[in-house]
Amino acid sequence: MKTFLAPMAGYSDRVLRDICRDFGADVVFTEMINCNTVINVPEKAKELLQIEKEKHPIAVQLFGSKSSLLSEAASILENWGVDYIDLNVGCPVKKIVKANAGSALLKNLSHLEDIIVKMRKEINKAKFSIKIR
């Protein structure tokens, strides 16, 4: 059985990930990140994720609302060497839900299905998962 460090906004930085690995975590997540940041401001995304010299496996959780942007961001993350890509479909935080992301995606299951299908087409090597509450 594998042990995962979950993505925690404000906490899952490089230091915590290294500590959790030292204590036996098999897979560690970065903090969740907006797909728009990965696409439009890749330097900022790399700085936030701190995965340049990361040990593997490394996992990233994406949030967003547009299938085209989420799938493009997933492709970019895979090219950066990310081993696991997770779609956030559970975050109840008001500003995430207001942007039609996180748990708001559950309001329109056909749209969610479209997102999943498009992301799967872009992800070739990384493992894909969905966070839901």
Where on the chain are the PLM-derived regions?
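Extreme N-terminal starter segment of soluble prokaryotic enzymes
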Residues: M1-F4
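Generic enzyme active-site microenvironment
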Residues: F29, Y84-D86, S129-K131
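Short beta-strand segments
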Residues: Q61-L62, N88-G90, K131-R133
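Conserved alpha/beta-domain cores
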Residues: P7, S71-W80, V89, K107, ...
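Glycine-rich, positively charged N-terminal anion/phosphate-binding segment
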Residues: M8-D83
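Glycine-rich, proline-tolerant flexible connector loops at the mouths of alpha/beta enzymes
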Residues: M32-E43, V89-L109
